[in-house]
C-alpha cells in the first residue's frame, strides 16, 4: 500500500514537473516551425522538385540521342553472309555492332519554348512553396489568437463562477435566517450550473483550438503544448492612415505569393501555346549511324581467315542524313492540343482575375473588421472605466457600512470581467491590424 502511495505521489510530481517545463510558443516560433514542418508546405516542396525535374528533361531534349546495339550468334541453312552480302549454305557465326541517333535541327522553336514554359512553371512551383507557407502562417496566427481568446474566456467564466458561489453563500445564510425565499437560492444554483456549463464549453473550445494549432504545426496531439501570451500594450501597430485598403491592395498585388505565382503560370501558358502551335508544322531532323560486322567464315584472297579486329575495321561504315517530318494527319491531336493550350491560357488569366478580386475583397473586409474591432476595444475601455468607478464608489460605501459584502464582491468581479473582456478585444483589434500589415507585405509578427 505504501509503495502504491509513493508511486502515485511520484507520478503526480512528474506530471507537475512536466507541465512546469512545457515550453511556451510565441507567434514567431509558431510560424517558423509551421513553415518547415506543415504537411501542405512539404507537399508544395515535393511538387517544386518534380517541376524542376521536368525542366531538366526539357533542357536535355536539345541534345542528340544515341543508342548502341550489338547482336551475335550462329546461322544455319541458306542465309546471307553479313560481311559479303552473298548467300551461303555454310554454318557461320556472326556479330554486328551499331551506333545510331538523331538530333532536332529545326522545329519552329518548339524545344526553346518548351524549355521557357518549364522554366516559368519551375519558378511558379517555388513561389507556391512561399504561398503555402504564407497560408499556413495566416492560419497559425488566426488559431494563435483564438487560443489566447479562449484562454481569456475561461478566465471570465471562472470569475463569473466565483461571483455566483459568493452570491449562493450569502443567499443560503439569508434563507436560513428567513429573510429571503428559498426560490432565490434555487435560482442562483441554477445559474451556477449554467455558468459551469459555459466554463466547460470554453475549455472545450480552447482544447479544439490547441488541437487545430498542433495540426498546423504537424505536432503530435498528445504533446504538452502552451502558447505565450504577449504583452499586448507593447505590440507596435501602424496607423489606419498607413493601412488604407486601396494602398494595401496595390502593394499586395506585388508582394503576395499567389499573385506572383499566377503571373508566372500565365507566362508558362503563353509559351505552351507556341509549343503546341509548332507541333502542327514540319520539323527537320538529322540522323547518323555507325555500323560494323564480323563472321567467322570471312577469308582474304589467299583463303586465310581474316582476324576479328581486322574485320571490324574493314567493315566499319558510317552514314549521315537529314530528314523532314510533316504532320499531315494526327487524328486531330495536334489541333486539339493547340486549342486546349489557348483555353488553358485563358483559364490562367481568369484565375489571376479571380485571385486579385478575392484579395481585394479580403483586404477591404479586413479593414472594416479592424475599424469595428477598434470600436469594440474603445467600448470595452469605457466599460472598464465605468466598472472601476462603480467599484471605487461601492468600496467607499462598504468601508462606512453602507454596502454589503456580496454587493462589493459583485462589483469587484464585474470590474475583473470588464478588464478581461477589454484585453480580449484589444488582442482582436491588434490582430486585425496585423492582418492588414500582412497583406501590405510586412509578414506576421507581434
Give names to the regions the model predicted.
Residues 25, 135-251, 369, 373:
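Periplasmic alpha-helical coiled-coil/stalk elements that build and connect Gram-negative outer-membrane
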Residues 18-67, 221, 228-267, 371, ...:
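Bacterial Sec-pathway N-terminal export signals of envelope proteins
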Residues 42-46, 59-60, 91, 105-133, ...:
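Sec/SRP-type N-terminal targeting helices
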Residues 6-13:
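Bacterial N-terminal signal peptides
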Residues 21-23, 69-103, 231-240, 274, ...:
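Small/polar, glycine/serine/threonine/aspartate-rich low-complexity segments that form flexible
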Residues 175-179, 398-402, 439:
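A short glycine-centered flexible hinge/capping loop motif at secondary-structure junctions
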Residues 20-143, 284, 288, 332-335, ...:
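Short flexible linkers and secondary-structure junctions
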Amino acid at each position: 500500500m505504501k509503495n502504491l502511495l509513493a508511486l502515485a505521489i511520484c507520478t503526480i510530481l512528474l506530471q507537475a514537473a512536466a507541465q512546469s517545463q512545457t515550453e511556451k510558443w510565441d507567434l514567431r516560433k509558431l510560424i517558423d516551425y509551421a513553415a518547415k514542418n506543415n504537411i501542405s508546405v512539404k507537399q508544395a516542396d515535393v511538387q517544386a522538385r518534380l517541376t524542376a525535374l521536368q525542366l531538366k528533361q526539357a533542357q536535355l531534349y536539345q541534345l542528340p540521342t544515341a543508342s548502341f546495339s550489338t547482336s551475335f550468334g550462329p546461322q544455319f541453312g541458306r542465309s546471307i553472309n553479313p560481311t559479303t552480302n552473298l548467300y551461303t549454305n555454310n554454318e557461320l557465326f556472326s556479330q554486328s555492332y551499331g551506333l545510331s541517333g538523331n538530333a532536332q535541327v529545326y522545329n519552329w522553336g518548339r524545344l526553346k519554348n518548351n524549355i521557357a514554359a518549364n522554366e516559368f512553371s519551375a519558378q511558379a512551383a517555388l513561389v507556391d512553396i512561399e504561398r503555402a507557407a504564407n497560408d499556413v502562417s495566416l492560419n497559425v496566427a488566426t488559431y494563435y489568437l483564438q487560443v489566447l481568446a479562449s484562454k481569456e474566456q475561461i478566465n471570465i467564466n471562472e470569475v463569473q463562477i466565483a461571483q455566483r458561489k459568493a452570491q449562493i453563500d450569502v443567499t443560503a445564510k439569508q434563507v436560513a435566517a428567513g429573510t429571503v425565499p428559498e426560490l432565490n437560492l434555487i435560482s442562483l444554483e441554477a445559474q451556477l450550473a449554467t455558468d459551469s456549463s459555459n466554463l466547460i464549453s470554453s475549455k472545450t473550445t480552447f482544447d479544439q483550438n490547441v488541437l487545430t494549432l498542433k495540426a498546423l504545426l504537424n505536432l503530435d496531439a498528445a504533446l504538452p503544448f502552451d502558447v505565450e501570451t504577449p504583452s499586448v500594450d507593447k505590440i507596435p501597430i501602424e496607423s489606419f492612415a498607413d493601412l488604407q485598403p486601396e494602398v494595401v491592395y496595390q502593394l499586395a498585388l506585388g508582394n503576395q505569393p499567389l499573385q506572383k505565382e499566377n503571373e508566372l503560370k500565365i507566362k508558362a501558358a503563353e509559351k505552351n501555346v507556341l509549343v503546341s502551335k509548332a507541333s502542327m508544322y514540319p520539323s527537320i531532323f538529322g540522323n547518323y549511324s555507325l555500323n560494323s560486322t564480323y563472321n567467322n567464315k570471312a577469308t582474304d584472297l589467299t583463303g586465310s581467315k581474316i582476324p576479328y579486329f581486322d574485320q571490324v575495321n574493314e567493315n566499319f561504315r558510317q552514314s549521315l542524313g537529314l530528314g523532314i517530318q510533316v504532320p499531315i494527319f494526327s487524328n486531330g491531336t495536334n489541333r486539339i492540343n493547340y486549342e486546349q493550350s489557348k483555353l488553358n491560357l485563358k483559364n490562367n488569366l481568369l484565375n489571376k482575375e479571380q485571385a486579385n478580386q478575392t484579395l481585394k475583397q479580403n483586404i477591404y473586409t479586413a479593414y472594416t473588421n479592424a475599424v469595428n474591432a477598434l470600436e469594440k476595444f474603445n467600448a470595452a475601455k469605457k466599460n472598464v472605466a465605468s466598472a472601476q468607478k462603480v467599484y471605487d464608489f461601492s468600496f467607499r460605501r462598504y468601508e462606512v457600512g453602507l454596502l454589503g459584502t456580496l454587493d462589493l464582491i459583485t462589483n469587484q468581479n464585474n470590474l475583473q470581467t470588464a478588464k478581461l473582456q477589454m484585453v480580449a478585444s484589444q488582442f482582436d483589434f491588434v490582430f486585425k491590424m496585423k492582418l492588414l500589415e500582412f497583406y501590405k507585405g510586412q509578414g506576421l509578427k507581434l
